[in-house]
Amino acid sequence: LIPNEGLSRKTVYNNVILVGDSAGQANPLVLEGIRYAIRFGEVAGRVAAVAIRSDNVNETTLMAYEKEWKKAIESKINSAVKVQNRWVGLSDEEWDKELSIIEELTADEFLDFIRADFGVSKMVKLATHHPKMIVRQLFNMVKGT
């Protein structure tokens, strides 16, 4: 079972570090998280090693792990959750409109999109190349969807 409701509220406890799916480190758009599990498994290992060497594996010491991974992907996951939540309520007609916009993306733009890579520079590039997408999103914001 892959969680798709976003990030776990807390991923470190005394003597415990949650990584991957158990930490909510999965992209809700495609329900994929192996990249995050590998990347942050390494971070967890590094933080745990430091904690063990210092003989202090309490939550406060392990919090370095949570701060690092949240800094790296929290905004991506939260953005993807917003897209997913909007998609869940779409009618067939609305899906057709959405897909017609997605079909206009290049392969690289599509990959950035499904990776939830919604950084400012990527969004500006999308707005420049795909004004129809931006107009649609603004309309949805005004409509409240």
Question: What do the predicted segments below correspond to?
Answer:
Residues 49-145:
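C-terminal helical "tail/cap" subdomain of flavin- and related membrane-associated enzymes
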Residues 1-47, 53, 59-63:
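FAD/FMN-dependent oxidoreductases across multiple families
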